[in-house]
Amino acid sequence: MTQDLPTPRGRLTPDKDLSGLTWLRVGGPADWLFQPADVDDLCAFMAELDPAVPVFPMGVGSNLIVRDGGLRGVVIKLGRPFMDISVEGDRITAGAAVLDARLAKEAADAGVDLTFLRTIPGSLGGALKMNAGCYGSYVADHFVGAQAVLRDGTQVTLTRDDITFAYRQTDIPEGVTITSVTLQGNREDSRVLHTRMEEQLAKRDATQPTKALTAGSTFRNPAGFSSTGQADDTHELKAWKVIDDAGMRGATRGGAQMSEMHSNFLVNKGGATAADLEGLGEEVRKRVFQTQGIDLVWEIMRVGVPEET
């Protein structure tokens, strides 16, 4: 990118390789990576940035495939200045860069039940953007409000009336950067909450490839809701089930594989490219549609351009 960009107080890095910033460890470079010093720095930068330059707010890369040709424009990555957490009664306000797991633990310390976040990979801004959920609870169920910076640098407050929530998605526009989120949870004994989270972690580690290079669930459940984690949760329209029925558990392409442990987890077995991973996912979608007439929808976000050949 040759355009002149504003000079921020934070860090602005050209031609930044993004593969090391994603959990799948794949992807090409961003034209620019911007790490703002604080909210004011972010607002000023966005206000001065040419409106024609694309902007992509990036969390911790836990639910993301960056294509091998990289991302055009500016990738915004929030860091330490956006990691504060404050508690007021049953409400928790946290910076968008706070990890979901950390928020769940600190909320539990305060006797506030946000335990559903404990096993969700990623940070709070991304969790809001995709209405993340687990064990029958979603961000939408706890959402009070958020602070955000629009593409023109305006800082705004978002309420429930400003966001439409659906399964694994919201209508928050592209280019809007969430900076903090307020959630509300039921009051409960801290020890009970921590015990619940330990049980959730044990169940996750026993059923999911947590030690592999993965981006979490690859496809949304066709049923249109997440697993509740309860023993009576036996509905057939789970992504892993239809993938199994299509014979795609363990399927490979290059260094990519649909996990043998949990077939809705796309993993980098070593040396995979973004094209391997996305291509295998598309093979799975095609096979599931051919065998069962079900159109699987990606849960992992895929961004950027393919590598030129």
Swiss-Prot record:
| Statement: the UniProt record of this protein carries the keyword Cell division | yes
Query: What molecular functions are annotated in GO for this chain?
Result: FAD binding; UDP-N-acetylmuramate dehydrogenase activity
EC number(s) of the enzyme?
Answer: 1.3.1.98
Which EC class is the enzyme in? Answer: oxidoreductase
Which domain of life, per UniProt? Bacteria
Subcellular location per the Swiss-Prot or TrEMBL entry: Cytoplasm
UniProt-annotated stretches for the region Disordered: 202-231
Query: Which keywords does this chain's UniProt record carry?
Result: Cell cycle, Cell division, Cell shape, Cell wall biogenesis/degradation, Cytoplasm, FAD, Flavoprotein, NADP, Oxidoreductase, Peptidoglycan synthesis
Q: Which reaction does it catalyse?
A: UDP-N-acetyl-alpha-D-muramate + NADP(+) = UDP-N-acetyl-3-O-(1-carboxyvinyl)-alpha-D-glucosamine + NADPH + H(+)
Cite the FAD-binding PCMH-type domain residue spans from the record: 25-188
* Key word DNA-binding present: no
Identify the cofactor(s): FAD
Instruction: Give a GO biological-process term.
Output: cell division
Family per similarity comment: Belongs to the MurB family.
Protein name, UniProt field: UDP-N-acetylenolpyruvoylglucosamine reductase
What are the top taxonomic ranks of the organism? Bacteria, Pseudomonadati, Pseudomonadota, Alphaproteobacteria, Rhodobacterales
